[in-house]
């Protein structure tokens, strides 16, 4: 953060330094023992060894979701890597959905590609099938193909490489399994299993029941890394929290005098804004607000999504003229202030302040105090 100052003990878990970010679909952080937020690692040894084989072009054997062994070769690994690259393009835009990429191949040639681009919009498989139609000239340029015949037959007999098991239920979008079956796909290569109880193997089962060959766990470690937070939330029903702070090489987070100054460089600050783009919410204590007057918005070189901004403020001390409140009035990202102050007591000054904040677009969330206040 800009202007990080020496933290002072606060009640109600309020800190003047650092920020915590709760994610529903952040990508690229995986958990390791003793290091809760280590980038790009923490996968199981079997999967890592398999990926190493892929890098050398050797076939690797995995157990598929039916319990039988399946093999994949260097081509399978190559096309799955491309699907992973595509999936990353949705980072920050698909919350709370997972990141998914899909590549459709016939006779060693890519005939369609797609990824889940935005929450509520078409999934990766349907986008890839629509791309098949566009490339073949059977679909209107820039327009999605028919959900009933997503590739207009041009993907008949092809192989689909998908980073996550295709969905088989109806939500904001129809099942991807139906689209793959209708398109005449002959083989589906899956990276990650979907732990969502609505899928959880049922997608692969539906494809097999339709006569489609399904090979699972291809580059599973890399595919799992795409959705470490989605998997955590689905499995544990709790937010995946990333702690971020600025620290000097000798382990200090502020000057001895306590005055605020930059201790991070432009690369680190750019990384922070990339985090904010990819995460669903950002949380700070009132100490940070009082010391730094931050905006907590995503300010990348290219447009990014904006996380919900959360302030832990046990006594409702947030200044009404601070940057957070002003930006909320100007239509910036949502702002939630969690407080233990007696905002329900109409006669209290805190209740009047809460009403003024609400009139400016701030959501004041009343929570019961814990033992520490």
Report the location of each language-model feature:
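Zn2+-dependent cytidine deaminase-like catalytic core
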Residues: 104-222, 308, 340-346, 363
């Amino acid at each position: 953060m800009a202007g990080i100052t020496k933290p002072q003990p606060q009640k109600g878990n309020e800190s003047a330094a650092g920020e915590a970010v709760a994610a529903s679909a952040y990508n690229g952080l995986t958990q390791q023992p003793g290091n809760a937020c280590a980038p790009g690692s923490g996968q199981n040894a079997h999967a890592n060894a398999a990926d190493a084989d892929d890098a050398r072009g050797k076939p690797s054997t995995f157990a598929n979701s039916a319990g039988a062994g399946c093999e994949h070769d260097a081509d399978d690994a190559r096309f799955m890597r491309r699907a992973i690259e595509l999936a990353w393009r949705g980072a920050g835009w698909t919350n709370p959905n997972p990141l998914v990429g899909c590549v459709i191949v016939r006779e060693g040639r890519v005939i369609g590609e797609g990824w889940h681009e935005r929450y509520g919009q078409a999934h990766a498989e349907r986008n890839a099938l629509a791309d098949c139609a566009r490339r073949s000239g059977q679909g209107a340029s820039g327009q999605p193909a028919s959900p009933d015949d997503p590739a207009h037959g041009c993907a008949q007999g092809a192989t689909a490489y998908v980073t996550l098991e295709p969905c088989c239920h109806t939500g904001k979008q129809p099942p991807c399994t139906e689209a793959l079956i209708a398109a005449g796909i002959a083989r589906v290569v899956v990276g990650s299993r979907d732990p969502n109880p609505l899928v959880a193997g049922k997608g692969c089962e539906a494809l097999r029941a339709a006569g489609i060959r399904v090979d699972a766990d291809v580059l599973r470690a890399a595919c799992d890394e795409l959705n470490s937070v989605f998997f955590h939330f689905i499995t544990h029903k709790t937010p995946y929290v990333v702690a971020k702070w600025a620290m000097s090489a000798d382990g200090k987070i502020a000057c001895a005098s306590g005055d605020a100054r930059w201790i991070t460089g432009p690369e680190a600050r750019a990384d922070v804004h990339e985090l904010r783009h990819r995460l669903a919410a950002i949380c700070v204590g009132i100490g940070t607000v009082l010391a730094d007057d931050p905006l907590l918005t995503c300010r990348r070189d290219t447009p990014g999504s904006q996380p919900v901004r959360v302030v832990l403020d046990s006594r409702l001390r947030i200044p009404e003229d601070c940057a957070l409140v002003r930006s909320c009035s100007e239509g910036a990202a949502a702002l939630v202030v969690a407080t233990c102050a007696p905002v329900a007591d109409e006669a209290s000054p805190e209740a009047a302040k809460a009403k003024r904040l609400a009139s400016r677009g701030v959501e004041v969330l009343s929570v019961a105090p814990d033992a520490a206040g």
